[in-house]
Every structure is written in C-alpha cells, then in structure tokens.
Design a protein with these regions (language model features):
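Structural motif
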Residues: 68-69, 93
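Glycine-rich, highly charged phosphate/nucleotide-binding loops
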Residues: 47-65, 71-81
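A short acidic, amphipathic alpha-helical/loop segment
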Residues: 23-26, 81-86, 120-121
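ADP-ribose/adenylate-binding Rossmann-like module
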Residues: 87-119
Length: 149
C-alpha cells in the first residue's frame, strides 16, 4: 500500500520521538488528529490541534485512546516496544522514517533505519499483523493530500 493510500484511510496518527515540529504540523494542517510521544517519561504525550488555522501543541499526559497509524523515529532495537504500543492503540500501520522523498529521490531529512535494518524491521512488523511502510517522508505525503483536498 502506498503512503497516500495509508494516510487516506487514517484519521489519527501517533508520532514517536519526532525531533522537530514539521511532521506533526504538516499532519495537523492536513486534517489529522495528531499525538506525539516525545519525552523520556511514560506519559510524555502531546496533542496537536488547529488554533485559528495554526497548529499548536498541548500536553496530554497520557497516550491517546487509539491511533490508526504510528509513525516512528526510533532505532530498530526499540521496534518491539513500538509494535506493542501500536497494537494497544489498535493501529493498522507502523511507518518508519526513511531517507526517500515522495519523488523517490534521496531525502536529506534522513534515514533513521539503515537499509540493512529495514528488512528485519519490515519482517517484525508484518509478523505482528500490522502493515509496514518506510517511505516516503510522511510530511510530504500529508502536504500533497492537503493540496489535493
């Protein structure tokens, strides 16, 4: 399934450990409910919402009740925990940040998982019963969906 198809079916996205605001803001502007797990504590969750057309975040202090999609920026060694959280939230898909842009070219925003780790990561996620995606950059897909709307 493509990134556009996956986002087209999702309404709620949990982002794990994203280091900047570009992804949650792009998803929020595209109409998604966005939550971010972003700190070392077990209850370090934020919610993104639109306030007068601008994305703003507020401390939630707990995981969301559910998420259709989990977008992770964590190393493969932590994937078991990411899968467990995704299943708890009834997510359908784990999308892991890759180094490929929506146009299919290398993306300077980075590749958290090296190419040799993507295969094992994909296997772990698929074996758990969830869908797996590693490209393209999710913010680019959200912006494209927003423009098409």
């Amino acid at each position: 399934m493509s990134g556009k198809e996956i986002l087209g079916k999702a309404r709620t996205v949990l982002i794990i450990d994203w280091p900047s605001k570009d992804v949650p803001e792009a998803l929020t502007l595209a109409g998604f409910q966005v939550f971010v797990k972003g700190g070392p504590g077990p209850m370090d969750y934020e919610r993104y919402e639109l306030d007068h057309g601008k994305p703003v975040s507020s401390h939630l202090g707990r995981p969301p009740d559910r998420a259709d999609l989990v977008y992770s920026y964590r190393p493969v060694g932590e994937l078991v925990e990411v899968i467990s959280l995704a299943k708890t939230l009834h997510a359908h898909t784990i999308w892991i940040q890759s180094g490929v842009s929506i146009s299919g070219e290398d993306d300077p925003k980075g590749c958290w998982l090296a190419e040799d780790q993507l295969g094992p990561a994909r296997s772990m996620v698929l074996t758990s019963g969830l869908d797996f995606l590693s490209e393209p950059y999710i913010a680019d897909v959200a912006r494209e969906l927003q423009r098409a709307a």
